[in-house]
Amino acid sequence: MDKLTIQASGALAGDVVISGAKNAALPILMAGVLAETDFVVSNVPNLRDVNTSCELLRCLGAEVSRSDEGKITISTTHLNEFCAPYELVKTMRASILILGPLLARYGTADVSLPGGCAIGARPVNLHLHGLEQMGAKIEVKEGYIKARVDGRLKGAHIFMDMISVGATENLLMAAALADGETVIENAAREPEVIDLANCLNAMGAKISGAGSDTIRIQGVESLSGCEYRVMPDRIETGSFLVAAAVTKGKIRCVDADPKTLEAVLAKLEDAGASITTGEDWIELDMQGQRPKAVNIKTMPYPGFPTDMQAQFCVLNALAEGTATITETIFENRFMHVPELIRMGANMELEGNTCIIKGCELLNGAQVMATDLRASASLVIAGLVADGVTTVDRIYHLDRGYEHIEDKFKGLGGEVVRVS
């Protein structure tokens, strides 16, 4: 099993090209099921979860091809299977996003209950309840969600009990082919939801309000394929910016979108970073200074993203002062903390809050990645730790970061993959 070995590298410097957003690419690939003609998606990152999504589509009978330039073409002409099996779904929670498209276009879907990162309960009941309001008959049996509808789904007024990105996306795709208007209230406002809505509209859907808490979808009878470019990955961008801040460096993220990172950029400025932005780039300069501690509370977008929480744990571990980080989105999302403590971080957990007293130095150690973003935080910690850090179980990292070791090397980081 692959590992990463990391050594303290000094201040990161240079340009890093940001990949397409995993969390936008996955639902957009699933939306390919809705298209009656060939669907082409570009700027798709080369990641384990993307490969799993392509394998799932092939398992259903779709033809999926990939070019070297990150372009994926999907044809559903021969799609004739409607079951997403446990073997694929168990490795990636986003597989649940096939449910809405299959049901909307074909009237039937069997989807195994999902797996993915072990970061607490992420219930699927919001997905199921919304589809039931649109006329689906659903039962959960033998570990599978079995959904059926006679004819087309019907437009409905859906109020989400809690904000859920995945449920918003699933219902958005299902409603695109429903009969009549669907209104989703208390919808997720994340940029990835907007990207999916823009893609569906390019396919012929009639969606308005994405990015607000109320989305309106006027169902259409069919959708066509199109060519669509996935948005930049805001979490990858934020991860590199934090790495630069922790190493007291100066980097520029290109092919990025500053508008999607306002909460993160504000916290980096609070930490002492000088931030400059253009339309598609972000530059961070720490001017050789140690970061200042910053308090964080994760919130749904446009608040501070839960997917950046672990990285800011590392920043605060090395910052001047004391800070708290409160996690409000997921339970069990501080599994990186014991690993950082093994590296010398001064942290303690109280419920869903981590109290961090900054120290000047971390020590290299053998650590274990427990989920996707936790693994990124351990790599960042290794870049400033005294000695060698080895990160095990980096298959988590490969689910969400494209060529991470090569990108860090390009900035001067000593990060090596060992088989």
From Swiss-Prot:
Residues annotated as transmembrane: none
Residues where UDP-N-acetyl-alpha-D-glucosamine binds: 93, 307, 329
Biological-process GO terms, alphabetical: cell division; cell wall organization; peptidoglycan biosynthetic process; regulation of cell shape; UDP-N-acetylgalactosamine biosynthetic process
Keyword Cell cycle among UniProt keywords: yes
Subcellular localization, as worded in the UniProt entry: Cytoplasm
Protein function: Cell wall formation. Adds enolpyruvyl to UDP-N-acetylglucosamine.
Similarity comment text for this entry: Belongs to the EPSP synthase family. MurA subfamily.
Protein name according to UniProt: UDP-N-acetylglucosamine 1-carboxyvinyltransferase
Name of the gene: murA
